[in-house]
């Protein structure tokens, strides 16, 4: 069994020791592939000096998250890896994370993506965005035929301190999951393909999950596995929030091949009005016009995804 952990770096030097070090400490051996997106903080030199075992690629340009990971995908397929694990530069795993996820994937090959619980540093709480995805589908372990552990405890122990068999608990199925921690088996990668170039930064993971479901796969979370996503939550300019939540969210919906394009387009029309009122801004209308101009590319994307 060969696992390739793909890490895309861009000025993330402060996280790299914990990020890459966690892969080195994994109970299940894995190879490291680091694509540096033209960092200016010395990230690439640091990786070369401290993790000589990693396959390090220094890009002359910042290709963005999607295309940089696509380079790693192609490398994994070319070198015959059985699994790829996408790991954000601001994230790290526990020693048991990879082994737990691989065991779950082997037992449930109908999942294209499996994620551990994505938590804050110190394992005090779930990542806020992750919790929005996970909570509606099974925060309570009794729904998964397991004992109920403390809210943030690793579910290898029940409320009385006894062990819980992970094999009795199938993955929690969700619609989408953020790609800070993704285990993808080779078959799923070969079937679903690369990240779509229409989504260089935001939305690529949601689009990939939609395509995976179209091809008959599931997307899931394995609560027996834990990992950290140490992103900072800070106040963002309204323009950036509208771009990410409205524009990229609408683009994901329009490219979702599980629904007819006309249906998605009507939804986005209504979504535009709702967001314009919510944000008190005309920016959603400007972005809507841009989406209309992109309809030929959106149709091409849907055709590619259906192959």
Segments predicted by a language model, with ranges:
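N-proximal low-complexity "stem/linker" segments adjacent to membrane-targeting elements
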Residues: 1-22
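Short, acidic, metal-binding catalytic loop of nucleotide-sugar glycosyltransferases
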Residues: 21-30
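A conserved acidic beta->alpha catalytic loop
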Residues: 22, 36-45, 61
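Glycine-rich, basic loop-to-helix element that forms the pyrophosphate-binding segment
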Residues: 59-79
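Acidic/His-rich active-site region of diverse nucleotide-sugar glycosyltransferases
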Residues: 71, 91-192
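Short beta-strand-to-loop acidic/aromatic patch adjacent to the donor-nucleotide binding site
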Residues: 81-92
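A short, conserved alpha-helix in the catalytic core of glycosyltransferases
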Residues: 175-193, 198-226
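Non-catalytic, C-terminal membrane-associated alpha-helical segments of glycosyltransferases
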Residues: 241-252, 256-307
């Amino acid at each position: 069994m060969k696992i390739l952990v793909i890490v895309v770096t861009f000025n993330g030097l402060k996280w790299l020791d914990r990020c890459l070090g966690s892969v080195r400490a994994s109970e299940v051996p894995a190879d490291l592939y680091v694509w540096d997106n033209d960092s200016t903080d010395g990230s690439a030199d640091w990786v070369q000096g401290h993790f000589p075992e990693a396959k390090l690629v220094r890009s002359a340009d910042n290709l963005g998250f999607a295309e940089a990971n696509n380079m790693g995908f192609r490398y994994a397929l070319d070198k015959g890896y059985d699994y790829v694990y996408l790991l954000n530069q601001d994230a790290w795993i526990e020693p048991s994370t990879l082994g737990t996820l691989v065991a779950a994937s082997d037992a449930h090959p109908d999942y294209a993506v499996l994620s551990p619980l994505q938590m804050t540093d110190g394992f005090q709480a779930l990542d806020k965005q992750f919790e929005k995805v996970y909570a509606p589908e099974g925060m309570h372990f009794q729904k998964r035929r397991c004992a109920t552990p403390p809210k943030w405890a690793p579910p290898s122990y029940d409320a009385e301190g006894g062990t819980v068999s992970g094999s009795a608990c199938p993955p929690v199925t969700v619609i989408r999951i953020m790609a800070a921690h993704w285990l993808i088996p080779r078959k799923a990668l070969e079937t679903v393909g690369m990240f779509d170039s229409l989504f260089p930064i935001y939305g690529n993971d949601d689009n990939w999950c939609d395509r995976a479901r179209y091809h008959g796969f599931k997307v899931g979370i394995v609560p027996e596995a834990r990992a950290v996503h140490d992103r900072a939550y800070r106040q963002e300019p309204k323009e950036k929030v509208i771009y990410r939540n409205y524009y990229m969210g609408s683009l994901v919906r329009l490219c979702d091949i599980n629904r007819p394009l006309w249906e998605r387009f009507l939804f986005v029309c209504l979504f535009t009005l709702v967001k314009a009122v919510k944000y008190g801004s005309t920016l959603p209308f400007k972005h809507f016009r841009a989406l209309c101009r992109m309809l030929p590319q959106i149709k091409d994307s849907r055709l590619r995804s259906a192959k």
